[in-house]
Amino acid sequence: SKDSVYQAIKKLENTYVIYTLKHDEKKLQKIYFKDFGLRNNLCISKDFSHLFENLVLSELFKFKEEFFYNKYFNFYSQISKIAYISSPTLDIDLIKLRAKKILPKALELGIFHVIFITLSSEDSFFEQGVKFEVISFDKFSLGF
C-alpha cells in the first residue's frame, strides 16, 4: 500500500540510507542515496547522468544546507541563493543556451550565482547580474 511505501522511505531516510529532496513549489520529492554506490548496485538502469547528479548532491552535503529542486535547477539553496546544475556532458555553448533559458527563474528566486558542474569544462560569464560558473567536478569536490 501507499502508506507502507511512505513508511519504508521514512525508515530509510532515518537510517541515513537515502535523502529526500523537496520540490520548491509542489509536494514532490526526489530520492537520492547517501551512498551513491549502493544506488548504482541496486538499480537495473545505469544512467550516468542520474548517478552524476547523486554524486553532486553527496558533495553538497558538506555545506549543511537544505536544498530544493525544480525544473530549472537540480539543487538550490534558499539561504545562500546559489543554484547547482549537474551537466556532465554538455559543452560550453549548450550551457550558455541553457543559462539564457533559466535566467528568468534565477532572477525570480533571487539567485545570483548558478554553478554548472561538468566532467571537465570550465568557464564563467554574467547575464543580467547573475554569475554563471561552469566548473569541473574535481574542482567542485575539492572546494573550488
Regions found by a protein language model. Give the residues of each.
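Accessory nucleic acid-recognition modules appended to NTPase machines
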Residues: S1-K81
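Conserved catalytic cores of phosphodiester-cleaving nucleases, focusing on short active-site segments
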Residues: V56, L60, F73-I102, V114
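Short, polar loop motifs at secondary-structure junctions
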Residues: Y72-F73, I117-S124
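Hydrophobic/aromatic beta-strand patches that form the interior of the parallel beta-sheet core
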Residues: Y84, I115-I117, E133-I135
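Short, conserved loop/helix-junction motifs that constitute active-site signature segments
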Residues: A106-G110
